[in-house]
């Protein structure tokens, strides 16, 4: 895993190095029930490092919550490795319509749907983020995505609008 430092420089972490960096927040994590959220880029591509980080935490008596903010657009094995240890999955779905999804991301959403179904089957805690993306989907598309998610059993849905910066 890596993180952006306050100086705007990316820093790479080993699982042990990340543990050493965040352990100073242990009291806060225990007081609030908090933990570490992996996001940015696609954290599931670092699933082995996240797994090793979690193991290092447990080996050191730290049962911090692990959250993943993901697109889920990776082969199933990447998510499967973490299913039992992730406390909360935050999934940016873009749109459930395959054509809209591909127009926006350049990829199909088969992995997304398959992985989402796998998480649901494993009773994972999931929040799905469904954005209105100007020039890519409409309010009606967002409603259809939410309806499809409800049919799958998803109840925690974060609907929002992408903000496009103008110069």
Regions found by a protein language model. Name each.
Residues 19, 23-162:
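Conserved AdoMet/S-adenosylmethionine-binding subsite of the radical SAM
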Residues 16:
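Alpha/beta-hydrolase active-site loop
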Residues 1-12:
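Canonical Radical SAM [4Fe-4S] cluster-binding loop centered on the CxxxCxxC motif
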